[in-house]
Design a protein with these regions (language model features):
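N-terminal beta1-alpha1-beta2 submodule of the flavodoxin-like/Rossmannoid cofactor-binding fold
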Residues: 1-108, 112
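Short, glycine-/small-residue-rich phosphate/pyrophosphate-handling segment
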Residues: 111-136
Length: 136
């Protein structure tokens, strides 16, 4: 059994299906003896916008932007990472795209020389929620 589970959720609405599914995933992990941490990108105040600082880091001209480091630490501590989010207009929400662009990045998740990054050998589960009223 994996010991450390990180559940990442992204939905601006509290009491959403996203939050319920993320909480259920975390509760199931705890019932089986794991520890679970839920990271809600909205509650964290995560900024998904890829900036000049992110680009400078990617090019090797600047350090990792400080606001992404705490999230990277939580990711690095996890054995299993579960991403839980709704589908908007046939794709992931901007917050999740920003997570990939800004946090799951060069120098952390991978290295240009091919050496394993901090997320090597992690198990990832992606739970995408779809459905809605007929008007959508």
């Amino acid at each position: 059994m994996s010991n450390n589970i990180l559940v990442i959720t992204s939905n601006p609405e509290k009491d959403s299906m996203t939050d319920a599914v993320g909480a259920a995933f975390a509760a199931g992990a705890v019932e089986r003896g794991a520890s679970a941490d839920v990271l809600d990108l909205y509650d964290e105040g995560f900024n998904p916008v890829y900036s000049a600082a992110d680009r400078a880091h990617y090019l090797g001209h600047a350090p990792m932007p400080e606001d992404v480091v705490p999230i990277q630490r939580r990711l690095a501590q996890a054995d299993v990472i579960a991403l839980v989010f709704p589908i908007y207009w046939y794709t992931m929400p901007a917050m999740v795209k920003g997570l990939f662009d800004r946090v799951i990045c060069r120098g952390f998740a991978y290295h240009p020389d091919g050496t394993p990054g901090a997320l090597a050998d992690r198990t990832v589960r992606v739970i995408m929620l779809t459905g809605g009223s007929r008007q959508w």
